[in-house]
From Swiss-Prot:
It is an enzyme of class 4 (lyase). The active site is at 95 (proton donor). The gene is pyrF. Gene3D superfamilies: Aldolase class I. NCBIfam families: pyrF_sub2 (TIGR02127). Keywords: Decarboxylase, Lyase, Pyrimidine biosynthesis. One of its GO terms (molecular function) is orotidine-5'-phosphate decarboxylase activity. Pathway: Pyrimidine metabolism; UMP biosynthesis via de novo pathway; UMP from orotate: step 2/2. It catalyses: orotidine 5'-phosphate + H(+) = UMP + CO2. This is Orotidine 5'-phosphate decarboxylase. The keyword Lyase applies. Pfam families: OMPdecase. It comes from Variovorax paradoxus (strain S110). Its EC number is 4.1.1.23.
Length: 274
């Protein structure tokens, strides 16, 4: 099953547009887990088990594992998700971007070592830095387009004088993902929930590609505005929330609290569909 097939199945089965981001910070862990980096897997696995029936995808952020020398725990978590939530696609949030030969190795890391269904990428180095990922049939790749952070406009909001119409950089990336770069229909775009007007513009330029939309919850993005700007019946959106769900409680009931927060967010997203 391809990434897009898996995504469509999860959306239908779970009635959800919600992606839960797995950004483990041991200092924020509850109770007996607090401060213990050796328990990253335990924390994340409980979040996964509590929310698997409510999501369209999971999105582990690789830096939160690598910073604690926990790559082996990430491998263990990926296996746990394949075994216990086999119908839910996993997007490895790595934001890689490098020359072709190095990109080939990063693609192997994402799709073979970790077994991810999709990965996030920076398109700044051009198509030859993206192409190695597209050789992995059935896998997905999300290009950073209009990101949720305030500094994103430093580059993404600048106009390209050398291109007809002088589009903003993020608009150019959207067109590339919809057209010439999307050779096998594997590309998607990352567009922040904090910029609903830009989500709407990206959807106009890229009407069929999936949008990964972070920024709902702790970053302040509005769920209703996000869905209304980006959702179309024939074009998937994946709305990510991380901290607001995984740290919904600092007590021993953290998994139950995460489930409650995920259900509330999922229902709000579904209700916002026009």
């Amino acid at each position: 099953m391809t990434f897009l097939d898996k995504l469509a199945t999860a959306q239908q089965t779970n009635g959800s547009l919600l992606c839960v981001g797995l950004d483990p910070e041991p200092a924020k862990f509850p109770g007996q887990l607090k401060g213990d980096a050796s328990r990253i897997y335990d924390f994340c696995a409980r979040i996964v088990d509590a929310t698997a029936g409510l999501v369209i995808a999971f999105k582990p952020q690789i830096a939160y594992f690598a910073a604690h020398r926990a790559e082996a725990q990430l491998e263990q978590l990926m296996e746990h998700m394949r075994r216990n939530a086999p119908g839910v696609p996993v997007i490895l949030d790595a934001k890689r971007g490098d020359i072709g030969s190095t990109a080939e190795q990063y693609a192997i890391e994402a799709f073979e070592r970790y077994g991810a269904d999709a990965v996030t990428l920076s398109p700044f180095m051009g198509f030859d830095s993206v192409a190695p990922y597209l050789k992995h049939q059935g896998k997905g790749a999300f290009l950073l387009c209009r990101t949720s952070n305030p500094g994103g406009s430093d580059l993404q909001g600048q106009r390209l004088a050398g291109i007809e119409g002088q589009p903003f950089l993020y608009e150019h990336v959207a067109r590339l993902a919809q057209g010439p770069w999307n050779l096998n229909g594997q590309l998607g775009l990352v567009v922040g929930a904090t910029y609903p007007a830009e989500i709407e513009r990206v959807r106009e330029l890229a009407p069929t590609v999936p949008l990964l939309i972070p920024g709902v919850g702790a970053q302040g993005g509005d769920a209703v505005a996000t869905v209304r700007a980006g959702w179309r019946p024939d074009a998937p959106i994946i709305v990510n929330s991380s901290r607001a769900i995984i740290y919904a409680s600092s007590g021993d009931d953290f998994a139950e609290a995460a489930q409650k927060a995920a259900r509330s967010t999922r229902d709000a997203l579904e209700a916002a569909k026009p």
